Amino acid sequence: MTALLSTTYFGPVQWYQKLYRYNCVLIEQHETFQKQTYRNRCLIATTQGVQALTVPIEHSPLTIDHSATRSNNGKCSMVNGQRSMVNGQRSMVNVQSIRLSDHGEWRRQHWQAIQSAYGESPFFEYYEDDLRPFFTERRWELLLDFNDAICQKMCELIDIHPKIKRTTEYLKPQTSNQIDFRDVIRPKHPLPDPDFCAKPYYQVFAQKHGFLSNLSILDLLLNMGPESIFFLR
């Protein structure tokens, strides 16, 4: 079976469960980018509770067919498969065109937040050198490439070996032969997923907050180390 997923930034345990359980995984690269999703956000456990780490992004400019926009009397038009708004409004851009923003200190801030949250976790020092480059190096320009590199490293550390490909075109919901999890795995208003049941594991702040389920794969990895794979089954 093949699972159809959206790209994620240090995705949740539920997302990595699909990588472990399915024979093949397709990452949708032609869907429209949506804010406040796991595409550029992950959730970690801190002393204050759940904290969201969000990667700021930039939209690549689109070449707009002005003759097409004029013919639509100022309404939306489709440009290269993406919806563009005229009159100076921002266009809707698909995921493969989203770039990482170099403004601000988000890399340093994310790394400091992770150090603060997991510095006392059982496996932070063990994996620290594997994780640091994602917050200190700027070799990735596109969000999709950045997320793919993170996914590859996380799979290596957890010791899972999924077959992952990117989609060659946008796959419409309920019309593909894959099991579609794109709207199932999201931080707000997720759809039901009978295939996933969070298994409690040790967390640094469990005595204060109880078990916080389905956080970033970082939470599972840094708390459980090599045993992480058992919580994806």
Predicted regions and their residues:
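Residues lining hydrophobic/aromatic ligand-binding pockets adjacent to catalytic sites
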Residues: 1-76, 83, 87-233
